[in-house]
Amino acid sequence: MPRLLPALWLAVAALVLSGCGGYATTSDTFRRSLTQGKPDSALVAVNKAMEVPRAEDLPKSKTDTPLLLLERATILQAMGRHDLSSRDFEAADKQLEVLDFTSDTAGDLGKYLYSDDAQVYRAPPYEKLLVNTLNEVNYLVRGDLSGAKVEARRYLVNREYFANKEADERGLVALGSYLAGFAFEVDGDAQAAMRHYGDAYEEGGVPGLEGVVQRLAARTGAQDERLKPLLEALPTLPDDDAQQGELLVVVQVGMAPYRKPERLPIGAAVVYASQPGPGARLTPDQQNQANIFAAKGLLKWVNYPRLVRANRFDPPPTTLELNDAIPVAVPEALNVEVRVEEAFKRIEGGLIAAAVVRLITRAIAGEVTQAAARKASGSGGVGLLLGLIAEGTLTALDTPDTRSWVTLPARFDVYRARVPAGTHRVRVRTAGVTREATAQVAPGGWAVVNISDVR
């Protein structure tokens, strides 16, 4: 029996060293590369994570495939490869399951014995909605109104689904509705455009929406009951209005918050996971079990995903210079950073509750194994070590679910103007970096410019 002890101690040590960093580690390289303005390097890193050699290749099915497709689609968009970006967004959208903490119990959340990230990725509602929003941008930049309108309809279906689920996504969805309105407006369907603009207004609005709907109403007579406060006085259109066109510039700035592993003392975790709030919470029996094991010294820490800001400071305002004119501020249309933080706050208690439940499961496994081994071997030392191995196996393989869409921007800024037909030079300055693009606008036509590689 003494000869067995060193081998068992080695097994325990191996388990301690065998834990992995989870998605926070996997995503760190491409997240940092995009933050540094190196989307090419980010693409190499995300392809490596997907185990594919090129952006043209789709990965084999695995638990993180939908999320990695979202990451690559965002990176490809930053590189201006909008066709492949659309393909990845659509492939991810078909596979993406939506997170619903409203009906889960802590036991359901903890049923994956080894790790939260052992299950297929399930996205929070804001991620599902932003898939359609970003893909609308892809189609509009390419001049594909048919594709943009299809994406707008998908967006509408998802928006109505979450409205029926009473998901608190007001304000997040205004930008998607605004882009849908733009697509239908420039395609000549003024009444459908006005309905989408009405949705955007009802959901909190987008800067410049008032002027957009007033011009559309003056030009076409289209109306929406919800927009009446904005349509009481309509502008007089210039004589050459029909010869002008629409220019839309969408700028993505900064990086959204991401999750990283955090250790929380068991006492604080039990208190936090037991307080009333949305989502799963510990039952009185689970609280009692956790406190008993903590008193025995078997439970000390809980691993859970903490949300951290990617940007130490808020990204500075964006300015735009059109055809060498005086630079103007580009208004913020959507603050993703704030929305991510609000959504995470709603589920944080449930995440901690799930971590505590798994911790209890590990402690029970360790005690049962230790007792059985002590009885079979007559050695308390062997029983202790086997108990440590049983608990250690689950501990080493348990990584908090740090998965989230880390390449999302912190903010969307949107500029829109009625411009003469012709070629227009757009110079955007954000976060100390300048990007230039040209836009060709035909008489009565339109163009969309997207700047998304400065994070």
Identify the function of each model-found stretch:
Residues 54-62, 96-107, 161-169, 201-230:
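Boundary/linker segments of alpha-helical solenoid repeat arrays
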